[in-house]
């Protein structure tokens, strides 16, 4: 055998084995052969991995649907279905589908609510925190959200007064940075009982510890989170690569794996601080970590330190850059669309007392135009732009979706970005920013059902109510107290990891007197 491998025929044998490695899975899934696929997507996961590595997977998949139609095979087992009629079939209650092995790449420390694939484990984990995020319960969080937004306003007022251009009156800043500081400090306050301190210091930093007993070090949390999202989404296309990722020649993977460890270290540090006896003794707040400590593991025991930290990490990830990315996108789309900010000014000035800087949730939750602006940004920007993959598990019967029959082992997804920009669903102006489309007199039942910024079904975002409250109060504050000018050319650039995130938004900002034209 060794002689054969070392002979001239060895190369041909190796090539033949390589071809069989990719060809056999293709032949095995004969029922998927009639679904068109771009490039080598039908034969190897590396095609999708490469698109994800480049940071524009959502665009490539969208273009593939424009070329091939509603069904596109984007990996040997994975079919993307650009059909709003498939949303409930793929993500709805009672279908038995599971999160695919894509989510294995996101596991750090211990499986958490986001990346667990076991249905019973997910039910147990969700039960621990779901009541904390109910509309009835989120009122307890508002004072902490409010306090951080007040500090945000204080810092912007300071910059408006001390850094303004004397000719234009505007102070220059990257709005994305400040939305990141705000979002991280809010989730730090809600989850761990204290903000990170980014707003106060005006910079991205966080303490991390490799273990609870390790000495502290400091990292840029926003940068760490970005890199972690990119590498995890990329490795999710080929989860078997994860153990070897740091040995790959592309530094993207080495840096990304380090970011995974650093982000886990941030959660370790925050949990460690929160569990200190003197902090526990003096704590009177019901924060997310307190709720998690009330939870039980699979044996009915209190959560161990590893699982508790993993769940805290889930809350940190879910509640930070999702909010900041969306806030930044809202500012961008409002600035680039004539007339929107003026309508916001009018609506906000009428609803909020003039002597109030940061409104309460009650003051802004029933302002229709503000809500329309937020929803329209979520539609056109699609912070979660990719199709979230679901696997049909063994034992499930075949299921027909969008006219095609799928079998156990197949993976399906519905691409949010493509659905949210479909002209068939949203009309000829689907790629334009039109807040008025959310007027109940205009919005169709189909459009309402096709809007899935928080996903849908049993694995939908558990923190939706808190996220919407944050966005309403943040946007109600920012647009009422400040005026803006665009200071960058061209569209706002984005890059996709697990989320579609802006790369920056350079604007001019100055104080606005509420009630002024």
From Swiss-Prot:
Main subcellular location: membrane
Cofactor: heme
Positions with a binding annotation for heme: 461
One Pfam family per UniProt: p450
Induction entry: Expression is induced in the presence of caffeic acid, p-coumaric acid, p-hydroxybenzoic acid, protocatechuic acid, and benzoic acid.
UniProt enzyme class: oxidoreductase
GO CC annotations, alphabetized: intracellular membrane-bounded organelle; membrane
Presence of the UniProt keyword RNA-binding in the record: no
Glycosylation sites: 282, 325
Segments traversing the membrane: 4-24
Gene ablation phenotype (knockout): Leads to reduced growth on benzoic acid. Growth is also reduced on benzaldehyde, benzyl alcohol, and cinnamic acid.
EC identifiers of the protein: 1.14.14.92
Reaction catalysed by this enzyme: benzoate + reduced [NADPH--hemoprotein reductase] + O2 = 4-hydroxybenzoate + oxidized [NADPH--hemoprotein reductase] + H2O + H(+)
InterPro entries for this protein: Cyt_P450 (IPR001128), Cyt_P450_CS (IPR017972), Cyt_P450_E_grp-I (IPR002401), Cyt_P450_sf (IPR036396), Cytochrome_P450_monoxygenase (IPR050121)
Protein topology in the membrane: Single-pass membrane protein
PROSITE patterns (alphabetical): CYTOCHROME_P450
Gene Ontology molecular function: benzoate 4-monooxygenase activity; heme binding; iron ion binding
Localization annotation: Membrane
Keywords: Glycoprotein, Heme, Iron, Membrane, Metal-binding, Monooxygenase, Oxidoreductase, Transmembrane, Transmembrane helix
Summary of the function given for this chain in its UniProt record: Cytochrome P450 monooxygenase; part of the benzoic acid degradation pathway also known as the protocatechuic acid pathway. Benzoic acid debradation begins with the conversion of benzoic acid into 4-hydroxybenzoic acid through hydroxylation by the benzoate-4-monooxygenase bphA, and its partner NADPH-cytochrome P450 reductase cprA which act as a mediator in electron donation from NADPH. 4-Hydroxybenzoic acid is then converted into 3,4-dihydroxybenzoic acid (also called protocatechuic acid) by the p-hydroxybenzoate-m-hydroxylase phhA.
PANTHER family linked to this entry: BENZOATE-PARA-HYDROXYLASE, CYTOCHROME P450
Protein family membership: Belongs to the cytochrome P450 family.
Protein name, as recorded: Benzoate 4-monooxygenase bphA
């Amino acid at each position: 055998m060794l002689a054969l491998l070392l002979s001239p025929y060895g190369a041909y044998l190796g090539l033949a084995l390589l071809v069989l490695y990719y060809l056999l899975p293709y032949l095995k899934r004969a029922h998927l052969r009639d679904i068109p696929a771009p490039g080598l997507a039908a034969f190897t996961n590396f095609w999708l991995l490469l698109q994800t590595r480049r940071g524009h997977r959502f665009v490539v998949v969208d273009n593939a649907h424009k070329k091939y139609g509603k069904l596109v095979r984007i990996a040997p087992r994975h079919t993307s279905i650009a059909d709003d009629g498939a949303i409930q079939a793929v993500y709805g209650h009672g279908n038995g589908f599971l999160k695919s092995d894509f989510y294995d790449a996101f596991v750090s420390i211990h499986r958490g609510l986001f990346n667990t694939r076991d249905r019973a484990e997910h039910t147990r984990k969700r039960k621990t925190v779901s009541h904390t995020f109910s509309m009835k319960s989120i009122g307890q969080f508002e004072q902490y959200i409010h306090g951080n937004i007040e500090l945000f306003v204080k810092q912007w007022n300071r910059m408006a007064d001390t850094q303004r251009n004397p000719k234009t009156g505007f102070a220059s800043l990257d709005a994305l940075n400040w939305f990141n500081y705000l979002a991280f400090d809010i989730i730090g306050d809600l989850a761990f009982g204290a903000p990170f301190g980014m707003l106060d210091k005006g910079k991205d930093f966080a303490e991390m510890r490799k273990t609870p007993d390790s000495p502290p070090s400091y990292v840029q949390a926003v940068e760490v989170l970005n890199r972690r999202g990119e590498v995890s989404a990329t490795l999710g296309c080929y989860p078997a690569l994860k153990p070897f990722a740091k040995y790959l020649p592309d530094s993207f993977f080495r840096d990304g794996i380090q970011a995974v460890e650093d982000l886990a270290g941030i959660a370790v540090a925050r949990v460690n601080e929160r569990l200190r006896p003197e902090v526990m003794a003096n704590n009177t707040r019901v924060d997310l970590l307190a709720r998690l400590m009330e939870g039980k593991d699979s044996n009915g025991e209190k959560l161990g330190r590893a699982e508790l930290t993993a769940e805290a990490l889930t809350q940190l990830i879910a509640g930070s850059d999702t909010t900041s990315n969306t806030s930044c996108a809202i500012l961008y789309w409002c600035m680039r669309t004539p007339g929107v900010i003026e309508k916001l000014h009018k609506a906000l000035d009428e609803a909020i007392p003039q002597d109030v800087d940061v409104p309460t949730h009650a003051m802004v939750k029933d302002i229709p135009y503000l809500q329309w602006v937020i929803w329209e940004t979520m539609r056109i920007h699609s912070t979660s732009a990719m199709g979230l993959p679901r696997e049909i598990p063994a034992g499930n019967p075949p299921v027909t979706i969008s006219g095609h029959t799928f079998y156990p082992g197949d993976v399906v997804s519905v691409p949010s970005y493509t659905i949210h920009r479909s002209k068939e669903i949203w009309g000829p102006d689907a790629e334009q920013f039109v807040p008025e489309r959310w007027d109940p007199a205009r919005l169709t039942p189909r459009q309402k059902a096709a809007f899935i910024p928080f996903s849908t079904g049993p694995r939908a975002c558990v923190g939706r109510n808190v996220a919407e409250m944050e966005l309403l109060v943040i946007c109600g504050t920012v647009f009422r107290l400040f005026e803006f000018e665009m200071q960058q050319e061209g569209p706002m650039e984005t890059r996709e990891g697990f989320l579609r995130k802006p790369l920056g938004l350079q604007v001019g900002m100055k104080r606005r007197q509420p009630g002024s034209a």
